[in-house]
Structure formats: C-alpha cells, structure tokens
Amino acid sequence: MPWDARRPGGGADGGPEASGAARSRAQKQCRKSSFAFYQAVRDLLPVWLLEDMRASEAFHWDERGRAAAYSPSEALLYALVHDHQAYAHYLLATFPRRALAPPSAGFRCCAAPGPHVALAVRYNRVGILRRILRTLRDFPAEERARVLDRRGCSRVEGGGTSLHVACELARPECLFLLLGHGASPGLRDGGGLTPLELLLRQLGRDAGATPSAAGAPASAPGEPRQRRLLLLDLLALYTPVGAAGSARQELLGDRPRWQRLLGEDKFQWLAGLAPPSLFARAMQVLVTAISPGRFPEALDELPLPPFLQPLDLTGKG
C-alpha cells in the first residue's frame, strides 16, 4: 500500500517546517528505492526477488505527492527496457490487464493507452513483444485493438502507431508480429502518413544518400535499405487490394527511380497502375488467413518465400 508523508508519523503534527522536512526525507527515500529497483531489473535478478522488492521495498513519488509501490505496468516498462524476459513473462501471466494498463502520470507524457507495445518495438524486444501479443489474445476485440493501434504522444512520438515505430526503426520481426496479430496498417501518424508512406519516404532518403564520391563504400547503405525493402514486402502482405493507392503521388513523382528501386511489378501495384502479381496475391491470402490466435506458430505450416524465412520471431536470436 502507498504510504503518505503527510499522514501522522510523517512529521505533519510538527507544523509546516516539520511536514516539509518529512516530505523531503520521503522523496529522498523514494529516489534511493527507485534506483535500487532499477538496478535489480537491469542486473536481471530473479523474479521472486524483484516481486518482493516491488511489493514491499521499492517506491516512487507519484503525481499526488505520495510514495507509491510500482504497479505491474510500471514494472513491465523496466523489464522491457532491460530485456528481463523472465520478469516480463511473469508480470504478463500473473497480472495480464494490470501489466498492460497505462502507468501513472510520472511514467508517461499524455493520456494515451499503455506504451508497452511501442516500447517493445523501439527496443526491439521481440520475445517480450510476442508474449504481450499472446496475452492480448484473451482481451476483448475492442480492448485488443486499442492497445495494438495506440497512437503515441503527438509531441514526443509524432502521433504514430507501433507500426510506424517498426517502420521508422527498421524492425521487420516486430512489424510482422504486429500485422499478424491484427494491427491496422492504414492508420496515419501526426504528419498524415501511413506506415507504408513513411517507409517509402525513408527508402527515398536511403536511395538519395548513396555515396557518390570516389572511393566511398558502395555497400554502406545496403543493409538498412534491404531491411526497409523487407518491411515493404511485409506491409504489402497485409495491404488490401486498392489500399496502396495513397502512395501513388510519392511513387509517380520520381517514376524511374522507384521503378529501379522496387522493381517493375511492385512499383506498378503500389502506384495503383496494376493489381498485385499472382504470387503476391496468393501470399496475401495465405498469410492473412492465419488467425491472431495461431500466429506466428501456423507459419511453420506454410511454404514461405525466402524473404520471410530468415525472420526470427521467437526473440531468442
């Protein structure tokens, strides 16, 4: 239970000066215990010890001026940052809704839903993200969609969804997991861009940054560009026929360059000039037929194309 420095025993009976001194001592103790909890999670200490600390020893100073124990939601944020998979799995299994609830005001900048999915993508915590998504399977559809399609703070995160974060940071494993669990690829960020449009802009910048000076290593931008092309292929699997037309202006603005970068078939489809190839359409039908409850396990039953096979969706790699 939270304790309050303003209550009897905290120095309030001694007047304003004593009350202020008690408050200062309480805040100092909170800082010490918060740092101890941070270190314990960072050092991957055993789950039982972390839970004992969270329940009885570690406190933070909340927005109401009280020393409060860390909630499962706040503890999960620490586990995500430090990749403590065992602790994250425990919190999600024991407190599924509380672990994914919004943290207190001191841990967020706005009233958006819990930031755990976006944080897992940002830190590339594939294993914990997979466990979060597995936990969401048992949530009602509306609640699940609210968590998956959470829009980040417009000031700090640009109003984007977790899919935008995955595209911005080139996280193909995270993107595939999110799409397979029903994240919406058509939502726009604060700048009005869908994940596909954001990705095309980044590909355009990558192509424009190719070294041209003599002696510069031509392969320097190759790996990031290949990851973004893989992201594009994954988004294409979940983009309904006709929905890619929003990228038309971007593509037709520099047609020769995009044809060279994407290949003719993909360019024609994304620019809205032709339907997807039979192969692309067949893969769309196969992959989108997998229900979130069987994703990604059911992928093992499919004859996947080579570009999907290197993806490690377990988080163990």
UniProtKB/Swiss-Prot annotation:
Protein name listed in UniProt: Ankyrin repeat domain-containing protein 9
Residue stretches of each ANK repeat: 71-100, 112-141, 158-187
Any one GO cellular component localisation term in the record: Cul5-RING ubiquitin ligase complex
Pathway assigned in UniProt: Protein modification; protein ubiquitination
Chain ranges for the short sequence motif Important role in both nutrient sensing and binding/regulation of IMPDH2 as given in the UniProt record: 109-110
Region called Disordered, residue ranges: 1-25
Family annotation (PROSITE patterns): ANK_REP_REGION, ANK_REPEAT
Described purpose of this protein according to its UniProt entry: Substrate receptor subunit of a cullin-RING superfamily E3 ligase complex (CUL5-based E3 ubiquitin ligase complex) which mediates the ubiquitination and subsequent proteasomal degradation of target proteins. Depending of the metabolic state of the cell, promotes the proteasomal degradation of IMPDH2, the rate-limiting enzyme in GTP biosynthesis or protects IMPDH2 by stabilizing IMPDH2 filaments assembly. Implicated in different cellular processes, like copper homeostasis and cell proliferation.
Gene3D superfamilies: Ankyrin repeat-containing domain
Keywords of the record: ANK repeat, Cytoplasm, Cytoplasmic vesicle, Repeat, Ubl conjugation pathway
BP-aspect Gene Ontology terms: intracellular copper ion homeostasis; proteasome-mediated ubiquitin-dependent protein catabolic process; protein ubiquitination
Gene Ontology MF annotations: ubiquitin-like ligase-substrate adaptor activity
Domain of life: Eukaryota
Gene name as annotated: ANKRD9
Subunit relationships: Part of an E3 ubiquitin-protein ligase complex with Elongin BC (ELOB and ELOC), CUL5 and ANKRD9. Interacts with IMPDH2; leading to ubiquitination of IMPDH2 and its subsequent proteasomal degradation.
Annotated compartments: Cytoplasmic vesicle; Cytoplasm, Cytosol
